[in-house]
Amino acid sequence: MSIDWFTFTAQVINFLVLVGLLRYFLYAPIVRAMQAREQKVTQCLTDAETAKVEANQQRMSLEKQTQLLQERREELLTKAKADADNERQRLIAEARKEADTRREHWTSTFERDQKDLADQTRRDIQRMGFQAARETVQQLADEDLQKRVCQTFVKQLQTLGEDQLAAIATQLADSGNPVLVRSAKGLDSSDQNQIRDAIHRVFENKVEVRFESEPALIAGIEMDAGGYSLPWNAERTLKTMEANVA
């Protein structure tokens, strides 16, 4: 069997041309498309991995933030509870202090009011007692009592010391006023003469003596000599007693 080298060569050339054409027009675009697709897939995979890494990082960041928030929340809750307890204790202490202050104030006010009431009651009782004593003495004051009062006054006058008498005499001389004798009731002539004579004996001169009635003296006599007062009466005694018990 003989070979037609021309035909063989032509077929080889045609095959090579066909391969070249296929490679240029068909295989090259397919390869480029496959490479582009591969690059795109690779890029997608890379992007996906990057997104996965970023997602993991975000997840970890969120978890960390969540943990921090939880810790902060617990810290805030603990602090808020402690602050609330402290405030409650402070309010309770203030309420107790206020209650104690009010109780002490009320107790003090009550005790003071009780004392004031007791003092006022005591003063009222004393006042009524002394008023009753005045009225009783006034009712019991008769002529015999008046004479005894005059006698007692004369004795009291005679017990004055020399210094007192000299001072009274000087005041009488300087003032030029008469000796004024006041009595709860008007003195009869004998009582007036008794007192006048006693005054003249004491002062050793004829000083003028005047007599006046003063019901407020209550069974007593009072002498005013140039500004010097010599009292002897129940009213003075009662006032002294009132001052002592006030």
Curated annotation (Swiss-Prot):
Cited InterPro entries: Alt_ATP_synth_F0_bsu (IPR017707), ATP_synth_b/b'su_bac/chlpt (IPR002146), ATP_synthase_B_chain (IPR050059), ATPase_OSCP/dsu (IPR000711)
CDD domains, per the entry: ATP-synt_Fo_b (cd06503)
Bridged cysteine pairs (disulfide): none
MF terms (GO), sorted A to Z: proton-transporting ATP synthase activity, rotational mechanism
Keyword Chaperone part of the UniProt annotation: no
Family: Belongs to the ATPase B chain family.
Record-given protein name: ATP synthase subunit b 1
